[in-house]
């Protein structure tokens, strides 16, 4: 590359080339700093994307790692995945557990889901379910569907129930299963159960009270006419 002597660019001893002029025009990237207004705010500075909602766990499948929560205000069933639960170790929810969360649309377009799920106080850890699936840690307890107890055995090898009869794992009775257990209904629908019990008591009281037969009415009317 040819070089030329440029006045003001050298002290007479150093030669100056066009390449030097190009380098002089390049910005000084090292000294370039973002101003305060140009900095991207951190996550802590960002406002919450949506309001914080509150609800309770409707059910949660600990084996598959997902379930649903019921929103307190709308009563909507919101999908929840274990990856969105604020807890350490095995992540799950207990049935009826109180939670708070944010809501967003699901990526597959099938309704909405709860995320950043924690206790009623934001950031508070969750209790989770006592039921754990059998995995590498065989000592983890799970609920047997035959005896209703938390143990390390499965229902097909239950040592506590020798017959083929199933046991309600809600109350332990052999007369019914958990799906129709009155204790389960009383726990989750107390107002409806109380109304049904009150109606049954009223009908029982009517049946036990003495009633006046048609013959008694005719006899009473006959006595009144004779007088």
UniProtKB/Swiss-Prot annotation:
Protein family: Belongs to the lin-28 family.
Ranges annotated as CCHC-type zinc finger: 143-160, 166-183
Result when mutating residue 23 to A: Reduced ced-3-mediated cleavage in vitro
Keywords: Cytoplasm, Developmental protein, Metal-binding, Repeat, Zinc, Zinc-finger
Originating organism: Caenorhabditis elegans
GO MF annotation terms: enzyme binding; mRNA 3'-UTR binding; mRNA binding; mRNA CDS binding; pre-miRNA binding; primary miRNA binding; zinc ion binding
One annotated GO biological process: ubiquitin-dependent protein catabolic process
Site (Cleavage): 31-32
Protein name: Protein lin-28
Induction remarks: Negatively regulated by the miRNA lin-4 which causes degradation of the mRNA encoding this protein. This requires a lin-4 complementary element (LCE) in the 3'-UTR of the mRNA encoding this protein. Also negatively regulated independent of lin-4 and this is counteracted by the action of lin-14. Positively regulated by TGF-beta signaling.
Gene that this sequence comes from: lin-28
CSD domain location: 52-120
Subcellular localization: Cytoplasm
InterPro entries: CSD, CSP_DNA-bd, Lin-28_RNA-binding, NA-bd_OB-fold, Znf_CCHC, Znf_CCHC_sf
């Amino acid at each position: 590359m040819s070089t030329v002597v440029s006045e003001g660019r050298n002290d007479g001893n150093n030669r100056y080339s066009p390449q030097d002029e190009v380098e002089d025009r390049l910005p000084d990237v090292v000294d370039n700093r973002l101003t305060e207004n140009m900095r991207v705010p951190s996550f802590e500075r960002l406002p919450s994307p949506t309001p914080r909602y509150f609800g309770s766990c409707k059910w949660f499948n600990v084996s598959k790692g997902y379930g649903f929560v019921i929103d307190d205000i709308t009563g909507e069933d919101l999908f929840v995945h274990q990856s969105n639960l604020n807890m350490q170790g095995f992540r799950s929810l207990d049935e009826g557990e109180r939670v708070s969360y944010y809501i967003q649309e699901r990526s597959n377009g099938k309704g909405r889901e709860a995320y950043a799920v924690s206790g009623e106080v934001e950031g508070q850890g969750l209790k989770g379910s006592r039921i754990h699936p059998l995995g590498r840690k065989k000592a983890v307890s799970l609920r047997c569907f035959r005896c209703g107890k938390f143990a390390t055995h499965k229902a097909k090898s239950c040592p506590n129930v020798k017959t083929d009869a199933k046991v309600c794992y809600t109350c332990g009775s052999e007369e019914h299963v958990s799906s129709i257990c009155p204790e389960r209904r009383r726990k989750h629908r107390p107002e409806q159960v109380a109304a049904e019990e009150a109606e049954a008591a009223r009908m029982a009281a009517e049946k036990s009270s003495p009633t006046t037969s048609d013959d008694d009415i005719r006899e009473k009317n006959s006595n009144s006419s004779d007088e």
